[in-house]
Amino acid sequence: MGFEIADTEGRYIQADFGKLSIASLYLPSGSSSVERHERKWQFMHYFMEILKGYRSDGREYIICGDWNTIHQEIDIKNFKSNQKTSGCTPAERAWMDDIINDVGFVDAFRLVNSHSDQYTWWSNRGQAWAKNVGWRIDYQLITPGLKDQIVGESIYKEERFSDHAPLIIDYKDLTGLI
């Protein structure tokens, strides 16, 4: 990406197929220290400019991965008590709003699933998994041209691979873009 945080920490990878780009993002977490939170914001500011460029380059994008930020109140079990927690602050949620409302990316999961209690991350403390006290911080943000290609969604919880569960979006045949 030409951006130190992304490049040295392996936070973004993209594969291009014809007119379709599929990317994996691992946005920095800001929860471990003030310095990490500042580093997260540096990444977010830089990445916003990248996303704006993507919207004007004529390609379709699927950007999936751990965004380490919720978008809306529905995306976290304990919204009110986490307002000052990194990943749930008003400023971070506003950044997600900007990506979706101003830049024009689409939250593929929420496009087809408006139900609450749909989470992709649970703390390893306090039986969060067993009690479904989670956060939805994993996304597939897509360009609007892919909206009509979504045929299904799921969060895979049959096995635990980590503190995250895979977010799956099923698409119609995308070979016309490849």
Regions found by a protein language model. Give the residues of each.
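Short Gly/Pro-enriched turn/cap motifs at secondary-structure boundaries
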Residues: F3-I5, W129-N132, K157-E159
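Surface-exposed cleft-lining segments at the edges of enzyme active sites
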Residues: F3, P28-M44, S81-T85
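Short hydrophobic/aromatic beta-strand or adjacent loop that forms the aromatic wall/cage
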Residues: E9-Q14, R136-D138, H164-I168
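Structured beta-strand-rich core segments of catalytic domains in phosphoester-bond hydrolases
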Residues: M1-S31
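Metal-dependent phosphoesterases centered on the DNase I-like endonuclease/exonuclease/phosphatase
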Residues: F43-V133, I137
